[in-house]
Design a protein with these regions (language model features):
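Transmembrane and membrane-interface helices of multi-pass
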Residues: 1-188
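Extracytosolic and intramembrane catalytic regions of membrane-associated proteins
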Residues: 113-117, 190-202
Length: 202
């Protein structure tokens, strides 16, 4: 079950990179284009990896996956820089792990050599366009969790289909998916109907 959410998260994170690679343009074989595509790949996946690594330390305090509500939770924090510094000091080994992952990703990426076709004919555009459509088909199925007509884009609640207890949903989910699916979540605002003086009189 967790694989379905991992695939969806990876597709969301790499959506821009996938588009850059599959666009049927001869320009994509230029060194400048390839360099920019590499940076898009590294930055996008570094964010995803960073969120998962961060949650390794954050989870014991919240007992749930980090969601988009974290931004509202820290929006009024006056000493955020101090908290971040203390986090990096306490979990310095996670920082090394994060840097190491980025280094490995960059090295593995450099092993892939993109070769420009000797001659770009009309068949090039046709094949590239068909490849784009095929990957788009796979992409839609991946982010939706399937291709069935009744299938909708999977959300956090779908993790309950693969566990026996609600607290086990965090094992199935991953942090990037949880963050992306809750960025537009509506935060409930605190409303005061009575003043403190009125409450004391009741």
């Amino acid at each position: 079950g967790g694989l379905k959410f991992d695939v969806a998260a990876l597709l969301y994170i790499n959506s821009l990179y996938i588009l850059l690679v599959l666009l049927p343009l001869p320009l994509k074989y230029s060194p400048g284009y390839q360099k920019n595509a590499k940076w898009v790949f590294l930055i996008s996946n570094s964010i995803g990896a960073g969120l998962n690594i961060m949650d390794y330390a954050y989870y014991p305090f919240t007992l749930k996956r980090t969601t988009g509500t974290i931004f509202s939770q820290f929006s009024n924090e006056q000493n955020f820089a101090g908290l971040l510094f203390n986090f990096l000091v306490d979990y310095w080994y996670l920082l090394f792990l994060f840097v190491g992952l980025i280094y490995v990703m960059a090295k593995l990426y450099d092993r892939i050599q993109v070769v420009r076709p000797e001659a770009i004919r009309w068949s090039f555009y046709g094949i590239q366009f068909l490849a784009l459509l095929f990957v788009a088909f796979l992409f839609v199925g991946g982010v939706r969790g399937g291709w069935a007509h009744s299938t909708r884009p999977i959300t956090l609640s779908n993790a309950g289909d693969y566990v026996k207890a609600p607290e086990e949903m965090n094992i199935v989910l991953n942090t990037p998916f949880s963050m992306l699916k809750t960025l537009k979540a509506i935060a409930l605002k605190e409303v005061d109907f009575y003043t403190s003086e009125a409450l004391n009189k009741i």
